[in-house]
Amino acid sequence: TRRSSDLPCKAVEDLTTYPSILGGRVKTLHPKVFGGILCRRGLEQDMQQIEKYEIPEIDLVIVDLYPFEATVASGAEEPAIIEKIDIGGISLIRAAAKNYNDVVIIASQAQYQPFRDMLMEHGATTTIEERRWFAKEAFGVSSHYDSAIFNYFDGEEGSAFRCSANSQKTLRYGENPHQKGYFYGNLDAMFDQIHGKEISYNNLLDINAAVDLIDEFKDTTFAILKHNNACGLASRPTVLEAWNDALAGDPVSAFGGVLITNAVIDKAAAEEINKIFFEVIIAPDYDVDALEILGQKKNRIILVRKPAALPKKQFRSLLNGVLVQDRDLKVETPEELKTVTTKAPTAQEIEDMLFANKIVKNSKSNAIVLAKGKQLLASGVGQTSRVDALKQAIEKAK
C-alpha cells in the first residue's frame, strides 16, 4: 500500500478535516475531495473557487470498488451484501471520468498495467486521448457494477434486461471464418485451460452443450458431442468403462468431437481416449499420467472444470431483442410418469426411458434417442419430422 511505501501519503480525514462516519459509510463524500477532482483547470471561475476554499487539485484517481458480485456469489446474507454496495468509490469514478480533460481515472486493477505502461513510456504526462480511454474504461466498470446491483435486487422478477460483462475475449472468428466472434464473460471462473490452442466460437457452443448434458447425471458418466448433440454417452462404474461404451455408441461421429466426464480421468482411460482425434476434453481433474498422455497433441484443448454454478437464466438474441427463460432444471421421476398403453413398462424400461430423456432433452429437436442399460445406442437429431428422426436413430443403431 502507499501508506507502507516511501511515498508521501495523506489520509482523507486529514484533507477534509472530517472523520469517517457511520461505520465507514461516509468517507470521501466531501467538497474538498470532489472539488479537487471536478474543477476545470481551464475555467477561471472554478480555479478561483478552489483557491478560495483551499481545495487541492487531484490529477489521478485510483479506485478499487467493494467486491459486491463476489459477496453475492459467496452466499452471504443480505445485510453483508448491502454493505458491499460502494457509494464513495462509484462517485469518485464518475467524477474523475467526467473530468477526463484534466484527470486520469484508474477504476479497476485491470487498468493498472496499461497505466504503468503509459508512465514508463512518457512519464507523468498524459494525452487527452489516453485520459479519454481511461474514462471510457471507468464508465464500463461503473455501469457493470450498477447492473450487478440491479440484477441482485431484481432477482427472479425479470422486470428489465441488464447484462454486463467486464471481460471480452476476441475469438479467432465466429461460427464461420468470415464472421468476427467475441465472448463476453469470465471463462476462468468455470475452467482452467491447462493445454491446447485458443478456444473457438464453435468450441464454446459445444462446451456449453456438454456442460448442460453432463450435469444431468450423478453416476460416473462420459459423453461425446458433435455440433451440440450427444453422439455417445454412457454411465458406468469406472471412467474407462464409461468412455468405452460412450464411444461404442457412434465411433464415426466421435471423430473431432468434444468430450466431457464428471469423473477424474486416470491413466487407463487416457490411453484409450488418446487413440482418437478430438477437439476438447473436459473433466473435474486428471491424473498426472493422464495429462502427460492427453497432452501429446499440442492443439488439444484440455479443460479442468471448476465447481462454479451456472446462471439460473438463459438468454438468446433474436430480431431486435433478447429472449430470456429459466434454465431447464426439471428432472422427471418414475412417480410422475403415466402409463397410457395397455402394456405397462417394466422398472428397467422406465429406468432406460428416463436415462434417454436426459439426453433427448439436451438434443436438437426434432430428436429421438435410443438407449438401454445406461448407454446411448443411437439418436436422430435436428429433423423436421419426428418420423424421420426415428428412422435415422434406428438406422444408426443397426
Regions found by a protein language model. Name each.
Residues 60-83, 87-126, 180, 185-191, ...:
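A short, charged helix-loop
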